[in-house]
Structures are given as structure tokens and as C-alpha cells.
Regions:
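C-terminal beta-sandwich/jelly-roll accessory domains of carbohydrate-active enzymes
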Residues: 11, 16-17, 29, 36-187
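Non-catalytic carbohydrate-binding regions of carbohydrate-active enzymes
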Residues: 1-13
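Glycine-rich, charged/polar anion/phosphate-binding loops
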Residues: 19-21
Length: 187
């Protein structure tokens, strides 16, 4: 992230008992990037403090939390010092941004996980990451690009957002579940 290069050099370790092994926070008093990891077969939930513990200073504004990895997901606006739950999927890392200043992202959505394919002004392209059989209320959530219109699968939608339903049958089990043990065999 070129736009945050100047603050990413200031890092500190987070307490392992709260944030897991090798958890780090980088940034300044207004914007922090927090890295968490999970090297187990089960989803791990970390309780992230949106305050001094992660290096964020109080300025009277709400704290915006946005997950950036393994996908982008808006986690909402919260009070300074409050705690949010961040789930880290098995064998994954998570990158969380918390900030109490105006959003620098060019494109920002809420209501659904997504990836940005292209964020160039005039033609941003976003891949929505919904699960089969699920419905989502997708909203344009600020960012530095003003939208006049948007298309989802070639259909025009209003700039206030849209309901999106993904085709297919809703999953009965988690897609990241441990299926079974592997047996050794001769080759």
C-alpha cells in the first residue's frame, strides 16, 4: 500500500495471549494495520481492542474497522476503546485496518466480502465474494471515487446499493472444514 508506506515502518508486537502468536500492529496514532494468524484446523476468533492496546490514539471520532486480507470486508464504525471480534479462518492470516480519520481507499463497499480488481478512476472493477444461496445488501461506503452508476453482472444498480443473491444451494457445512486424515500409501 503505497499510500500508507510512511506509517507502515512503525510496528510493535501485540500481546500473544490476546492476539495469538507473532501478531503485529503497524501505523501511527490515527491508522493501524493489525496482522493476525491462525495455524490450526479451526477458526480462531480474536478480540481486538480499538484503542491504545493496538496503538490507536483517541481523537473523538468513531473507529472504522476494515478487514483487508484474505478479502476486504467492512466491519463497521465503533467507539474508541471498544472491542470487535475478528475471525481468522484455518491456516490463514488476517490483515485488519483500524482508523479514526477519513478513509483513504478509492473504493469502499459494505455488506459483503470483496476484492478490488481495478481501482482506477473512471472504471473501478470489484469482485463480490458471496457464498452460494446467500443474499447480501451491498452499499457504497465512501471511498475517494464518486459513483454516478454501477453495474452488477451487467445490470445497472443505484448508487445507494443493491440486494445481491448468489446462485446455488446454501452450503450445509463450512467450506474450510477438516475432511479427514490422509493415509500413507506406496508410490
Amino acid at each position: 500500500h503505497r499510500q500508507y508506506a510512511d506509517i507502515l515502518v512503525n510496528g510493535q508486537r501485540l500481546p500473544e495471549n490476546n492476539y495469538g502468536p507473532e501478531a503485529l500492529t503497524r501505523g501511527d496514532g490515527n491508522t493501524r494495520f493489525i496482522t493476525l494468524r491462525n495455524l490450526t484446523w479451526n477458526t480462531v476468533t480474536y478480540h481486538v481492542n480499538l484503542g491504545k492496546e493496538v496503538g490507536l490514539e483517541q481523537n473523538g471520532n468513531k473507529v472504522k474497522a476494515r478487514l483487508y486480507h484474505p478479502y476486504i470486508y467492512d466491519m463497521g464504525n465503533h467507539s474508541y476503546g471498544s472491542t470487535i471480534d475478528v475471525k481468522v479462518l484455518p491456516f490463514r492470516a488476517a490483515l485488519l485496518k483500524v482508523t479514526n480519520v477519513k478513509e483513504k481507499d478509492k473504493v469502499a463497499l459494505s455488506g459483503i466480502p470483496y476484492n478490488i480488481v481495478n481501482d482506477y478512476s473512471g472504471n473501478p472493477t470489484i469482485k463480490l465474494l458471496g457464498m452460494p444461496g446467500m443474499s447480501y445488501k451491498v452499499k457504497f461506503d465512501g471511498g475517494n471515487i464518486s459513483f454516478k452508476s454501477a453495474d452488477i453482472d451487467g445490470k445497472k444498480v443505484g448508487t445507494k446499493g443493491a440486494n445481491v443473491k448468489f446462485p446455488g444451494e446454501k452450503l450445509k457445512e463450512d467450506f474450510y472444514r477438516h475432511i479427514g486424515e490422509m493415509n500413507a500409501c506406496d508410490i
